[in-house]
Amino acid sequence: MSVEFEDWLTQQRWYAGRNRELVSATTAMAVRLRDGLELVLLQANYADGPDERYQVIVATGSGPIDEYSVVATIGIADGQTAYDALYDPDATRYLLSLIDESATVQNVRFVREPDVELPLDAPPRVFGAEQSNTSVVFGEDAIFKLFRRITPGVHPDIELNRVLARAGNPHVARLLGSFETEWEGEPYALGMVTEFAANSAEGWDMATTSTRDLFAEGDLYAEEVGGDFAGEAYRLGEAVASVHACLAHELGTEEVPFPADVMAQRLAAAVDAVPELREHVPQIEERYHKLADTTMTVQRVHGDLHLGQVLRTPKGWLLIDFEGEPGQPLDERRRPDTPVRDVAGILRSFEYAAHQRLVDQAGDDDDRARQLAARAREWVTRNCASFCDGYAAEAGTDPRDSADLLAAYELDKAVYEAAYEARHRPSWLPIPLGSIARLLE
């Protein structure tokens, strides 16, 4: 297939090289799945730094359906329109059928999980909520996720979903299938299919709705507002603890030293981007080095847990997207870590859910601002406590009993957030800076 990918690639939401100079995007591997449908792996070559690899399923013919013509059309190949096949219902149904058949096409292996049924006749639609992958929902039954930027190794999203599903854990969407290839002697995960959580609500949306209701009734306490989230926070804590316990049972645990030096290095790097952190460095380093001679229990965990990675269904909470921290190599994302990292991620997310509204509502009324800040702090405290209560009830151990460890991981997360906000969203920088000051009190 002869088609130029550069212009199209750089316009995609999932393209990670926007801040780099792309020299070329060449076809490194192409697998013909059927006439007019190819799985293409692209080598993105840059003026400096390492190359990146991306996956595109390319269809050729009359083009994608009209509403997606701009985002999906790649160019002209051999006199025909080449386009992203995920925007073609017939092509996506065919991809699902390959998984259903556990087919092998050249060096691409499709695998259906045991004892599952795939909704081959369900209508597909592209799901537009992701930044790094592309997903297609089939009816209300399954969601097909295509990994866009691919790296060698075992993919934790497939690996951990498979472990949890086969163990019968109720707090994940069941894995239905996956597909992978081998390139230059190394395995590459290409995509997966899980049950679709129809009629679900994202935890972030639920939490921010609760804070909106609280701020609309600023003279009421959090427990007095109709949208109080504490009960859901408790049940979420139970769900996270259940997943942690299941992963520990299935994949084991080990003891490792607390990573004081690693956290200190991240702090030093963040100070370069956020000079406001400098005044806090001695106290933060003191917190880290206080734990330097201690060991902690580590296991496989989610690794990037926050309220945007959990869904509330009619049956309970689900944890989704076990990919780990974006941008890290797969081996790093698969490294065992303390469950406290996931707990800290949720607690930091509560902080954001409340305080982002203060940023958005900033005005000239100082009394009103102080009142809302007090309500936000109260909301965060109440929901953090409820989450930890639920976690402790399920796990039998309370993360607050390891207060120094929990605070260290909250600080590490807040330092990362500060660097991110300084680069991408400066108006939100006061959120992590305020959290750091509070954690050091």
Curated annotation (Swiss-Prot):
Its EC number is 2.7.1.175. It comes from the Bacteria. Keywords: ATP-binding, Carbohydrate metabolism, Glycogen biosynthesis, Glycogen metabolism, Kinase, Nucleotide-binding, Transferase. Coiled coil: none annotated. It is an enzyme of class 2 (transferase). Gene3D superfamilies: 3.90.1200.10. Pathway: Glycan biosynthesis; glycogen biosynthesis. Disulfide bonds: none annotated. InterPro entries: Kinase-like_dom_sf, Mak_N_cap. Transmembrane segments: none annotated. It catalyses: D-maltose + ATP = alpha-maltose 1-phosphate + ADP + H(+). Disruption phenotype: Cells lacking this gene display maltose accumulation. It holds the Pfam family Mak_N_cap. GO terms for biological process: carbohydrate phosphorylation; glycogen biosynthetic process; trehalose biosynthetic process. GO terms for molecular function: ATP binding; kinase activity. Catalyzes the ATP-dependent phosphorylation of maltose to maltose 1-phosphate. Is involved in a branched alpha-glucan biosynthetic pathway from trehalose, together with TreS, GlgE and GlgB. Belongs to the aminoglycoside phosphotransferase family. Monomer. This is Maltokinase. It comes from Mycolicibacterium smegmatis (strain ATCC 700084 / mc(2)155). The lineage of its organism: Bacteria, Bacillati, Actinomycetota, Actinomycetes, Mycobacteriales.
